[in-house]
């Protein structure tokens, strides 16, 4: 689910957020982005 994406997904310094994005999409959200190295899902 969405909260597990925040814990599991690594957010790199230079905008690498593929892992976060994939996780959020699997959780049923539109996309995922990184904010201050934390994965955030966009419903």
Swiss-Prot record:
Q: In which tissues is it expressed?
A: Expressed by the venom gland.
What is the first-listed, main subcellular location in coarse terms? secreted
Secretion signal span: none
Record Pfam families: Toxin_17
Which GO CC terms are listed, alphabetically? extracellular region
User: Which SUPFAM superfamilies does UniProt cross-reference here?
Assistant: Scorpion toxin-like
The alphabetized UniProt keywords are: Disulfide bond, Ion channel impairing toxin, Knottin, Neurotoxin, Potassium channel impairing toxin, Secreted, Toxin, Voltage-gated potassium channel impairing toxin
Protein location = Secreted
Tell me which family the UniProt entry assigns to this protein: Belongs to the ergtoxin family. Gamma-KTx 4 subfamily.
Q: What is known of its domains?
A: The presence of a 'disulfide through disulfide knot' structurally defines this protein as a knottin.
What does this gene product do?
Reversibly blocks Kv11/ERG potassium channels.
What is the protein name for this chain? Potassium channel toxin gamma-KTx 4.9
Instruction: Say which species the protein is native to.
Output: Centruroides sculpturatus (Arizona bark scorpion)
